[in-house]
Design a protein with these regions (language model features):
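Flavin-dependent oxidoreductase catalytic core characteristic
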Residues: 1-164
Length: 164
């Protein structure tokens, strides 16, 4: 049902998505995109292989990568939001930075794994159609992971350990 709902959404075109506010609004958008990409990848794989999907180890591995990244991204977001609620945005700056960094890396992993699944499960016109759907689902502004990573590193070096 979730895959069918996603495919209906994809075929109907862009919709007015729920806009979140706060320091992690962009990361919530990335999480939603990662979920959609994962459902799309699962749909592509199940459509192609049906009952034989369990025999496609590389496809199953790529799907597992997507699922793990979605789970970890959501866990990271929820933990950061909990810290923001408890300590305030300023005191949770390190958690916000780490969440931004991880979300940027995770969406790239999900997108790459989805491409791998599409390449293994489709060909010809269907392949091109599914790639265009992937591009639409994976629209996001890339984060400056270099600056964010340096900010995290400075904080860790100053404290002599990870601080959260």
């Amino acid at each position: 049902p979730a895959i069918k709902k996603l495919m209906d959404e994809v075929m109907s075109g862009p919709s007015a998505a729920e806009e979140r506010e706060g320091p992690l609004a962009a990361e919530h958008h990335l999480l939603a995109a990662a979920r959609k990409l994962t459902l799309f990848a699962a749909g592509v794989a199940s459509q192609r292989y049906m009952q034989a999907l369990a025999d496609q180890q590389e496809i199953m591995g790529a799907l597992a990568d997507c699922i793990m990244e979605v789970f970890a991204m959501e866990s990271c977001l929820l933990r950061a939001e909990k810290l923001i609620a408890a300590r305030g945005e300023g005191a949770a700056a390190q958690a916000i930075a780490m969440t931004r960094y991880y979300a940027a890396k995770a969406i790239a992993t999900v997108e790459h794994s989805t491409r791998k699944i599409i390449a293994g499960a489709a060909e010809g016109d269907m392949f091109r159609t599914q790639l265009s759907i992937l591009r639409r689902l994976a629209k996001y502004e890339p984060a400056d992971t270099i600056s964010i990573g340096r900010q995290i590193a400075r904080s860790v070096m100053a404290a002599g350990r990870y601080t959260l």
